[in-house]
């Protein structure tokens, strides 16, 4: 199934716009019809079992994290229509990091670097350590 703007996922999440694609699938901004809150929906596109288990593990790890500089997955669902799993996460409306860096003051940039390092240090302190694998410059 190809998702598009306006798609209603599980009679709850109204897709508003496509953000991008990653290792496991597509990411969309959606409105949660139950709360009227914008969320990010990460839909697992490939249907192989190994990839699905990794996607599920990503949710489990994210759900258990507790750090102010890390996003927390709120829900793992399976689309009733096409059986594709999806994650519901907070939507960050300020755009990508790369779109923000150019307008940051030097002091804000150093705070940002400190916050990223703090989040990564938290991940690396877990047992076993969690390696992010998708950090972009």
What is each stretch, according to the model?
Residues 45-64:
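AlphaC helix of the eukaryotic protein kinase fold
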Residues 82-96:
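Conserved short submotifs of the Hanks-type protein kinase catalytic core
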Residues 118-130:
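Protein kinase catalytic-loop region centered on the HRD/HxD motif
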């Amino acid at each position: 199934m190809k998702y598009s703007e306006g798609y209603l996922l599980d009679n709850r999440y109204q897709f508003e716009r496509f953000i991008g694609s990653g290792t496991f699938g597509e990411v969309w901004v959606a409105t949660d019809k139950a709360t009227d809150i914008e969320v990010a929906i990460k839909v697992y596109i490939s249907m192989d079992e190994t990839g699905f288990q990794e996607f599920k593990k990503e949710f489990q790890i994210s759900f258990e994290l507790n750090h102010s500089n890390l996003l927390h997955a709120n829900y793992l669902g399976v689309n009733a229509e096409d059986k594709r799993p999806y994650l519901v996460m907070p939507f960050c409306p300020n755009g990508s990091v790369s779109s923000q860096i150019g307008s940051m003051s030097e002091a804000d940039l150093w705070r940002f670097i400190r916050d990223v390092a703090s989040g990564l240090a938290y991940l690396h302190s877990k047992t076993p350590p969690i390696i992010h694998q998708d950090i972009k410059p």
